[in-house]
Amino acid sequence: MQPASANNAGSFNDELLAVFKARKPWLVNRKIVSSHIFTPKYINNLINSDSPYLLSHSLQPVDWIEWQPSFESDFKSGDKLVFVSIGYSTCHWCHVMAEESFANTDIADILNQSYISIKVDREQWPLVDERFKSALELLKGEAGWPLNVILTPEGKIVWIDSYLNKDKFTKVIQGLAKRWQKQPKAIFSLASRIEATVNPDPLPTSNPETNPLSKSDWRKLLPKQHQSVYQALLNEQRPGEPRFFREIWQLGLLDEYLRTGNEAYLKAVENQLSEILLSPVFDAIDGSFHRYTVDSEWKTPHFEKMLYTQANMITLLAKAYGITGKQHYRIAMEQTIDWVELWLKNDSGYSSAVSAISEGQEGKYYHFSETPLDSGTVNVAGFKVVNRFTHDIQNENVQNYLISLDSLDSDWRELTSYQELKKYRKQKVKPELDEKVIVSWNSRYAIALLDAFEVTDKAEYLENSISLLESLWQAAKLDGELYRIVFLGRASIPPQMEDYALFAKAQFRLAFYQPWQTEKDDESKRKFYAQSDGNRVVESVGESIDESETSIMTTSALHDSSAATRGNWLLEQMMIHFDENGEHDGKSLYAKITNLNTDGEQSSVYTSVYEALALGELYSQSPVYKKLIGRFTKNHSHLPIEMFKHYSFVSSVADSLSPARLNHAIFAKGHGRIKAFYSEPNLNSKPNEVSHGGVIKVTFTMENGWHVNANSVSKSRFIPTTVKLDRDVADSQTDTDIRYPEPRIRKLGFSDSKLALYEGRFEIFLEGGVIQEGELQKELKSIDIRIQACSDQLCLLPETIKLNL
């Protein structure tokens, strides 16, 4: 694609000028252009983009164009080399290179004359970024942004690097342009050598189908994988290297603690969380977390804040609080949610990130100046000075400080110093937002809100998750198609696999809290999952249905507010859009996903798709989903290093074999739900008096037409519903009063006798009896529920469900 030249001032067309005028208020607000400029000197095609990062390059003299899906097969560059530059809005060095090089007319002349120049927002096109980042890591040992690549017209790498100053960058693009003109064969030869390094011929391997991983194999491998991650977390601190939170590792270890009771795993996570919360990487004043630290001791944050970081940390803190009951986890979680709601919420969802830079200086919003701290005008009691920075401002050295919490022993939000520090910070200029709404990131946050609700029972978290998912459904889905990005009210960019998967996962998670579907809905679902050839989803128009009909999911989900229906529609669309063999059986989907990213700051796409399919299968009993899930688990690499890189998937497989639940569960193949909640004991008793124990309420909801046997059964062949406490201390057997509801007496199709049943919604209460203050909460480990679900026609196998409070 040849862009209209922007090399000469004012050479752009009227269409670009019209778009500029429409977007001028936003550009002025972001200080990209002055309000008194009516016709800029340069406008390029990025003015049409739905990315704040790309828009910041839209008035540069370079003839930039956006990445397009068609570039995967053909750049249409004619005989020109292709220059691809990848970055993102909160990347400091991306903006430095933009000012030094891409705003420079001499460099623009070279690029415009000799290259097709493509600018990529890595958050819009994560797989494009992943491909070139992996190549840079292979060739140079490490990768960073901006990520700059020069390609042949066929798309083979000729040169790749990250930030270069203006002189070095000029030398590279000039040299390769001249060589391309004079010795194109030499360029092709160089590209072939690089291609051989980046994409070598695969080594012969055994066919995974002939040596699949069975459940028994997984059970043998899993303990080693958890131990490997545990050791990695302990050894993480290496001098001079950046440090990330490792939420994926910590969540997996907490789950394994729930399964095994291995205290070392819990201790490792608690130590890591304490270090984070007592460091400036946690913003204890506004709430929320910076992305990572540039040092190994959590002292110097990289100051940008990402929506996905907040989502991951909310989920981690919710689980830590659910397991330990320690209030500082809940406080940090609540603060982070409050920050996201205040800073990131917009009409279509939540903005993707907050920049590190304010007033032209990295981290300035978070710094405290020497004068207020030294003079005592700002009360910092309960906080500590962690790091000091020296800045050269107008030839004067100015001292700035970072502060963090000094203790986690009390609610820091109640400190006088906390209020004073908030007041001091409000005087500062806030860093800028990247307002684009990313479907997958927003879905992660919706899931995090549900995680927070499940351990706090705070209704606003559930309400916010519902509102967010509805906003995404309305804003990111147009004419039956999902899009990845919503920016300034406009949906764009084809969805990535992670968008389908995480949006579907969020919908299925929400379905737990929605009313059961009606019988009509169930019939629609049954028809949709009917099989035409043994393993195939019914297509929108296929040989197994009438030509005038459309897929039940495709039509109903577009208007249905049922989260489960919407989740299934998203999975159907994912399988269709990433299908290449026309069979809709998941084979080509699986082939694509095996080459996608490994765990990083976010869990891998492989894991996200697997988890979405697992939830979809639970709610729909789809044989297609079940078969594809089996392919994921059986065909995964046996190599320890591959399992380490996909630890989020390893954790998910472990959970499928032995669920690590907190206070809720789905049972009866999706036809029943349980949630348990603990209310504190009465602590108003006098000193040295015993207090009444807390009450655990276990709430069951059964789908219409399903039931479980009552606690007392008429015949021994029926399994009664029982609930009991499992305690840490075997010799501390405080009496527990368990109150079961009155059963309903009914006669069903499979029995001539009247049966005592529980159906619909019912509750079982466990009261701790007379115990010392707080004893129940300390010694309680879990609740064991024995249950058997039946419909009017059949009974499922009995289940034992363990919940942890």
Language-model region placement:
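Extracellular/lumen-exposed scaffold segments
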Residues: 640-805
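Glycan-recognition and catalytic cores of secretory/periplasmic carbohydrate-active enzymes
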Residues: 18-21, 49-51, 87, 96-100, ...
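Loop/turn elements at helix/coil->beta-strand transitions in domains of secreted/extracellular proteins
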Residues: 78-82, 114-116, 153
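N-terminal pre-domain segments of enzymes
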Residues: 3-55
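Short, ordered coil/turn segments that flank beta-strands lining enzyme active or ligand-binding pockets
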Residues: 58, 153, 285, 704, ...
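Electrostatic cytochrome c docking/interface patches
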Residues: 61-77, 211-215
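Local sequence-structure signature of Cys/Sec-based thiol-disulfide redox active-site neighborhoods
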Residues: 70-103, 107
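Catalytic cores of eukaryotic secretory-pathway lumenal/extracellular enzymes that build
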Residues: 37-43, 61-63, 87-92, 103-104, ...
